[in-house]
């Protein structure tokens, strides 16, 4: 095969990769601000969805969360992996999202109740082109836990297909003490539902 004939193939592969990434980002946008969702993402059979819409994975079958690091809304460096040894609650949100606004006080209340018990909350703010909007949201709802600033949604694309990946905004994931994904919700959460997600993971030895 000549160099001339190889060039279009490389170009086609690059174009296919770009289209795949764009489609993944678009899928997240289309499901944004939904009040519910479905389990799945690649045919994973290791998790079970309960009647409350919360999906869980047994301890021996969990997948590690991807690298989730970067700058927070306040400009500080944060790496979720640094919280290994604690139960981590990840919440994907946007200031423009009505269900996110509804659940924000519930997240803050449970965070205040559990932060002394080795539970760390981390937000991932997405689709906010202006960081000032995200900061205003936190101020309005009294959110005190840190949030990574991810305006393009690139952190969400790091989750492997077939795991308990976030598929809507809001989404909430619970990571066990080893940094593995133990539970997921694709809807806004009440205090009770959030505790239902966290308590079994917190009780694990």
Task: Name these PLM-found stretches.
Residues 136-143, 150-203:
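Thiol/disulfide oxidoreductase modules built on the thioredoxin-like
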Residues 32-35, 102, 177:
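Short, conserved catalytic or interaction motifs in soluble domains
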Residues 101-141, 153-158:
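Structural microenvironment flanking redox-active thiols in thiol-disulfide oxidoreductases
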Residues 1-67, 205:
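N-terminal targeting signals for export/organelle localization
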Residues 92-94, 124-127, 150-151, 186-187:
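Active-site-proximal beta-strand/loop segments in catalytic clefts of secreted hydrolases
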Residues 78-101, 107, 121:
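Short active-site neighborhood of thiol/selenol oxidoreductases, capturing the structured segment around
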Residues 62, 67-88:
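A short beta-strand-turn-helix
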